[in-house]
Amino acid sequence: QEWDSPLVHYGGPSDSDRPSSVYGKAASHIKLRIDGIKGASSKYFWRDKSRKAPHNAYTDLEKVLEAYDYTPEMRDPFQFSSDISYTGQMVDTIYLPFESGKDSFVTYTYNSATDKFERAMDGKEFIDAATDKPVEVQNIIVQYADTYVLYNDVKGRKMVDVKGEGKAEFFIGGKHLTGTWEKTEYEEATKFYLEDGQELTLKPGNTWIHLHPDDEEIRVEYRES
């Protein structure tokens, strides 16, 4: 809701009477939906047969933009500055754990030459299918949120509550910062703040937000100064 954008996805739970349903009451606010399972596959999605299904489906965001049947409101929820420089410990690697296994991690390793974080999964480089190069991220936000398994859901589906407030961690320019997040209404933008109360400023570039259970910790390794 806070982005006023279409929901682009490839299937999902569709039991209309369950809170997890991508077509249920919780999704009633969606203005435009593009679902690769239900008819949108041929126009907006394709599969890379050299990669293992089901995680080999891709889309073209320029084509998605052509699908708008309404005029979206231009929103700019983040502050950016190419001159921003934070003090703090220099990060080497960020470890974000999965519940599927104790040794299963998404990692981001800081590359000082590019000033970006390179993504890997379980120790293997996460390669961009379009460029055949490791995925690089300029800014990383870890947003801790209340996460719980839905009652009586045999598949263990989870709900993440993104309304309210909580702690957050930021990784910008190789530095590790801590702070908070706040979202007063579902349609309002999520605001991120540093420990001193100042609103977060990011470096120009792509920004990835990881929603993380608020009762679990991430691990960070630092470089020697």
Task: Locate the predicted segments by residue.
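A surface/extracellular/periplasmic glyco- and lipid-processing/surface-interacting theme
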Residues: 1-225
